[in-house]
């Protein structure tokens, strides 16, 4: 019999990843556009659109969601926004087609995120091939993506 006591990690994933602490925004703000991949890189330096250099040092595992305050300098708050990136925009014709497509995309360990009546997933060659084989209507667009990057899979 296998013993499951003393595990360092929980056996089942905990709902939701660590989120950066919420801070009140007071005064002017500068949006710092970050892609889904960049929003997972929480220990680094980056340059804001106004030229300010920000040094990030959030705890490992933190997810920088849009609206997270990265820091404040001289009364200006630097806030995360979702940068436009290459995505497949899928518009299934039926609920059954949506479920079948979501299942197939999930088998490739990709997020399938609802956005304004369509579904988005990061664009790459395997996704293009899959969607073409399924015969589901899709287009390639540049839009903000709020899911996880294609290489990250929970479980």
UniProtKB/Swiss-Prot annotation:
Question: SMART domains this protein is in?
Answer: UreE_N
State any GO CC term.
cytoplasm
Question: Which cell locations does it reside in?
Answer: Cytoplasm
Q: Which residues form a coiled coil?
A: none
Q: Which superkingdom does the taxonomy of this entry point to?
A: Bacteria
Annotated GO molecular function terms are: nickel cation binding; unfolded protein binding
Listed A to Z, the keywords are: Chaperone, Cytoplasm, Nickel, Nickel insertion
For the biological process aspect of GO, one term held by this record is:
protein folding
Chaperone listed as a keyword = yes
Fetch the Pfam families from UniProt. Answer: UreE_N
Family, according to the entry, reads as follows: Belongs to the UreE family.
| Role according to the record | Involved in urease metallocenter assembly. Binds nickel. Probably functions as a nickel donor during metallocenter assembly.
Name listed for the protein in its UniProt record: Urease accessory protein UreE
């Amino acid at each position: 019999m296998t013993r499951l006591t003393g595990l360092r990690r929980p056996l089942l994933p905990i709902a939701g990843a660590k989120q950066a602490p919420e801070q009140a925004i007071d005064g002017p703000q500068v949006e710092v556009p970050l892609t889904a991949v960049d929003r997972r890189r929480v220990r680094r330096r980056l340059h804001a659109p106004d030229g300010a250099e920000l040094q990030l040092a959030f705890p490992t595992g933190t997810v920088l969601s849009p609206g997270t305050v990265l820091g404040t300098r001289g009364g200006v708050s630097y806030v995360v926004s979702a940068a436009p990136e290459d995505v497949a925009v899928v518009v299934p014709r039926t609920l059954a087609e949506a479920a079948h497509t979501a299942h197939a995309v999930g088998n490739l360990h990709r997020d399938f995120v609802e956005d304004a009546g369509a579904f988005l997933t990061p664009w790459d060659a395997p996704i293009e091939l899959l969607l073409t084989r399924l015969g589901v209507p899709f287009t390639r667009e540049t839009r903000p993506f709020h899911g996880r990057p294609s290489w990250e899979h929970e479980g």
